[in-house]
Amino acid sequence: NGGGNYTEKNMTLAIDGSLKRLQTDYIDLYQLHWPERNTNYFGKRNYNHDIKEKKWNDYESVLKALKKFVDQGKIRYVGVSNETPWGLSKFLEISQALKLPRIVSVQNPYNLLNRAYDIGMSEISCRENVGLLAYSPLAIGYLSGKYRNNQIPKKSRIGMFGDFWTRYKEDNAKKAVDDYYNLAKENGLTLTQMSLSFVNSRPFMTSNIIGATTMEQLKEDIGSVEVELSDEIIEKINLIHANNP
């Protein structure tokens, strides 16, 4: 967790600690939370290569350590999070060559305002059968509509913790939210329902990681699984996205 040292010793401490806290014998899916190398994750749009950076090439040792945990029965499957096409490809390449545990999932952000996953990761997901566990499907609440017209509810995440997700405050993002809101309303849907249903419809999607602070929000989120977007709505969503990248 936290892009820390993925040594066998550190991962052993982390896994044993998790097993103890969870009071369970094994973990179904164990994911590496952050890439240990320098890369463009968590809101960074571009990769800035640092020639002075110490080269990180411990894929083999990390996978070998994970294999020990699988063999010991502590974990069953392994995944990554906040990964890039290059990083995921390296893990897959080395695991196949050395017959080590294969990455089965990647937990990255994905929503109507952040479709970076579509560019390179989606093809790898589909062709290599690595499912996306999409986090922030409502863009930290922007796609619920509660921040429209510069409103900031006191008990919202931004109201309590401030807003450092600058990409969602840009003018084109605000316009996109308004356009998505109107499209949902025209089709008898809430913005939340349409946003989550779109995420659910993607061919590379394995799990849509929703978040809710009230029972009403939870019911609306869960209800999105009953919503099936028409081809026409999908086409209009893609048009809004093209006009507000």
Stretches with model-predicted labels:
Residues 1-10, 50-57:
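Active-site mouth loops of central-metabolism enzymes
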Residues 11-28, 120-129, 233:
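Short amphipathic alpha-helices and their capping/turn segments at secondary-structure boundaries
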